[in-house]
Structure formats: C-alpha cells, structure tokens
C-alpha cells in the first residue's frame, strides 16, 4: 500500500479485495475530501466494518434482510449526509486525502506490517495533525469479511497490532468506546 501511496498524484481510495461496491461509490466516498480540506479519511457503511457496520453497529452482519447490495445502497443514497467525525477510518474501503498523506506520512510498516491496525494508527496521527476521519453515511458497500488471512494468522495479527496501536495511542480504545456509546448514526 505504501508503494502506491508514494506514487499517488491525487486523493486515494483503498479497497479490500473482498468488497463489492455500488454505482457512484467513488464519487460519494471522495466527496467529503474534495469539500473540506481537513478531512483525512472517509469510510462508508458496510456489513462488516466495526464502527461502520450496518444494521448492527460494531458487529459482523449479513446483507440486510438478504437484499442485494444495490437495493440497500439505494436507501442509503437518499440520506442527506452528515459526515460525522470518527476516531478512525476503517480500511476495508477508505478514501484518503493526498494532502494529509503527505503531511502525516505513510502507513507504519515497522509496527504493523501487513494486516490490521495500520489504518487506525494513521488516522490517529491524522487527528493529531488537525484532520478528521468521517463516516460517509450515504454510501453502503458489501464487505464479505475474513478473506484476507487464515483465521489463526488473523487472530495473531489482531493481538500483536492491537498492542502496538495502544502503545502508540493509549487513548485509542477509550476514544473508540466513546464513539460507540454516542453512536451518532443510530437514527440511520
């Protein structure tokens, strides 16, 4: 990812291979970055995206009532977006501001390597530099989840990278728990 970020000449969209996107997803994902200079990242709603999960917040979900992606997204598309600030973007499908990338730097390969936590660390560094990470509340993408790593390796990486994240950003869990308690998009 860092190799691509170094070559970027414009804003960037990171998308996992286990994600399906609807029509006009890129426009909606990137619009907040074009509209407001101090937005570092944008993340849509999805089935499995922790603080961006729908219908059950912070859970892995199946597609709502078995509906196809496009039908669910058609409902989200009608929402007047608020773009609430979040403590982190979520890397399954995340827009990144090129100016923020250049100011904050690249993903921390030394502490996170491949896997999990690198986007959370980057987003925390972006906040420290005066940026915001926002939820794109008028976009829904399907994240099949779990296809990136075998289960045993996933658990090991999650533990190691979570520990590294908390060493670098001791308030991360508190900030994320506060966001979850507030659940600013509950009405959706």
Describe the role of every protein-language-model region.
Residues 1-8:
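Glycine-rich, basic loop-to-helix element that forms the pyrophosphate-binding segment
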